[in-house]
């Protein structure tokens, strides 16, 4: 999961890469050491580590800003191409349809 987030950060040029790399090193080193040893003791300690969820929320907001372009255009928004609306009038220019055969 963190690998996917890291690739998104690289693509969108979001800062904080050193912090993420540092976190990844610690998770990789300690996974094998504590596997199955102290599951009961650590349950209460991990509840306080919800700051990581806040970081994800900030990351998602940054991604949404990149997609929608909020704040980066400085008032210059890209205008969508106006589609030409077909005028349905009495001028058919020789075209007929099945509904015209009354």
From Swiss-Prot:
Annotated GO MF terms: metal ion binding
Induction: By cold stress. Induced by heat shock, drought, wounding and infection by soybean mosaic virus (SMV).
Region named 9 X approximate tandem repeats: 21-58
Keyword Ribonucleoprotein assigned: no
Superkingdom in the source lineage: Eukaryota
Transmembrane spans: none
Keyword Metal-binding in record: yes
Biased segments, Basic and acidic residues type: 1-76
Bridged cysteine pairs (disulfide): none
Sequence repeats mapped onto the chain: 21-24, 25-28, 29-32, 33-36, 37-40, 41-44, 45-48, 49-53, 54-58
Region annotated Disordered, chain positions: 1-102
UniProt keyword terms in alphabetical order: Metal-binding, Repeat, Stress response
Biased composition (Basic residues): 77-95
PANTHER family linked: DEHYDRIN HIRD11, PROTEIN SRC1
UniProt similarity note: Belongs to the KS-type dehydrin family.
Biological function: Intrinsically disordered and metal-binding protein that may play a role in stress responses.
Protein name: Protein SRC1
Source organism of this protein record: Glycine max (Soybean)
